[in-house]
Each structure stands twice: as C-alpha cells, then as structure tokens.
Amino acid sequence: MEIIGIIAEYNPFHNGHLHHIKTIKEKYKDSLIVLVLNGYFLERGEVSFINKKDKTKIALNYGIDIVVELPFIYGSQSADIFAYNSIKILNNLGVTKIIFGSESNNIDLLDKIANIQLNDQEYQNKIKNFIFISKLFSQYYLLIFFFYCYL
C-alpha cells in the first residue's frame, strides 16, 4: 500500500485542492493519504482565514486519512524551512510518495529552479549580497531570482 503525503495550507480550501485529493484517490485507490497542514498561522506568519479545526474537518471530509499539524515554529517561516520540516514529518511517518499540485504543470522548470537553488554557487553568492538590500526574505529571494535569471 502506498502512503501518500500532501503538504498544504488550505487557506481557504478550494476546488483545486479537491481536484488534487480526488486525483490521488483515483490513481492510488488503496493508498493512505497523510496531510501536513498549517494551523492558525501560515507561511511568513500570516493569520489563516479558517481555523485549524475547521481545516482539519474539511480535509477529513474530502478523503484525507490523517492530518498532522505543522508546528508554528516551522509553518510560519520562509518556504524552504516550511517545506523542509513538512517533508521531514512525512518521512518520519513513513510516506512513500509526496504529491503536489502545480499551476504551471511544468516539472522541467521546477527541476531547473531547484538545481539552480541547490547547486549554483554564483546564485548562492548573490543571495548573500541581496540579504542586505531587502528586509524580507521573500522580497530578496524574488529579487535575486529575477536578477539571476533575466539580467
């Protein structure tokens, strides 16, 4: 049996989330679906529109088998910390596949971006330089990616 992992905020839960769950249930009929979900606060410390209990009920009602709350200390951080700790939780729970949705449906572009972020020393050096320009991680992250890719 496959144990499928999903990482989400469900803020709010929408048709794309429902489609995601339905597609997983159709493709992996005998699977168990584990969701790592933010609680009252979201990535970068924003307050969730829906409280964690209601988000959990919605997830369970639409076919998620197990919901695990991502602790605030990780869930309110930048995307890399959010993702790293979410995946760590899923790994500790024995998840065999992690499935995510995508607006672009372009896995090659995602792979290219990940390789740049992980392996390109010039990119890493530019990130360090831009830390001093912007106060918010998300702002300098976008700035450096723009300058790196387009200039």
What are these regions (language model features)?
Residues 64, 69-151:
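Active-site cores that bind ATP or allylic diphosphates and position pyrophosphate for catalysis
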Residues 50-54, 82-85:
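Charged helix-capping and loop-helix junction motifs
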Residues 1-52:
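N-terminal catalytic cores of NTP/NDP-binding nucleotidyl/phosphoryl-transfer enzymes
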Residues 21-22, 56, 87:
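Generic structural signal for well-ordered alpha-helices
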